[in-house]
């Protein structure tokens, strides 16, 4: 087990590491696209593979060690796809420009996708992939997608549920284990710890357990300092946690993760604004900002090699 792993529940361990500037280097994951909103929300959001690869490269140069990928449907860039060929193409193009960045694919997919469609991306050979721990409900208004954007549509109210059963979660965890894919368990509220502990008891996930605390989305925990601290107190031993704050909560939740020795996810999937009323110019803008703030707070930034060690991934990047 890496020396970077420590018990985040122990305030004395945190104090000792903070006083000696020995918190683990910060893994910065960038979620470049997402599976819900698109260029109608921010014209700078990458949808096509070429756009995704270009922005990933800029984020990699800025210091991101992991990229979280949603592939879009080339017949309708406004929607997601589970086609493993689409994911494989993106993976291969990114690997050519970013030789050691960690490739993290979504199995959460996009609204309206059944389980069978969402898991097809595993055929694209990711190094790690998201593993949702329960159903998600959506209720949000998507802006009208107007020409000259491709695939225009009217404003729509998204009122949907991404259903996930215990059996499906177990099946997906087993698939990942059999293929050597490290699951990133997406925890939206405290009840999901029941599922995590069930997976641990079945030996379907391996140490260190990568757990992403998602706060601020509908039906997830409210994005407050108190809720985040409570979630950290319930982490299993030998865990690595990252924090994904949604919308305006992205920056404050990321700052707390930096302080507490966790890791961060930023990017346009979760927040298309740099501040109120000001759209992000690129995903790299979000990466550059969080790295600047982390360094000001004496957190080193993890290289892809260090991130692989922290997460228990192979030191040899995947090839395509």
Regions found by a protein language model. Name each.
Residues 18-44, 145-149:
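N-terminal small/glycine-rich loop or linker at the start of catalytic domains
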Residues 32-54, 106-114, 158-163, 184-186, ...:
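Active-site mouth loops of central-metabolism enzymes
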Residues 40, 65-88, 214-215, 272-276:
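Glycine-rich, proline-tolerant flexible connector loops at the mouths of alpha/beta enzymes
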Residues 52, 59, 70, 129, ...:
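Conserved, mostly hydrophobic/aromatic
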Residues 78-105, 172, 176-178, 230-238, ...:
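Alpha-helix-loop-beta-strand connector modules within alpha/beta enzyme cores
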Residues 81-163:
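Active-site beta->alpha loop and helix N-cap motifs at the rims of alpha/beta catalytic domains
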Residues 130-269, 280:
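Catalytic alpha/beta core domains of metabolic enzymes, predominantly
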Residues 141-150, 276-299:
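C-terminal helical cap(s) of enzyme catalytic domains, especially alpha/beta-barrels
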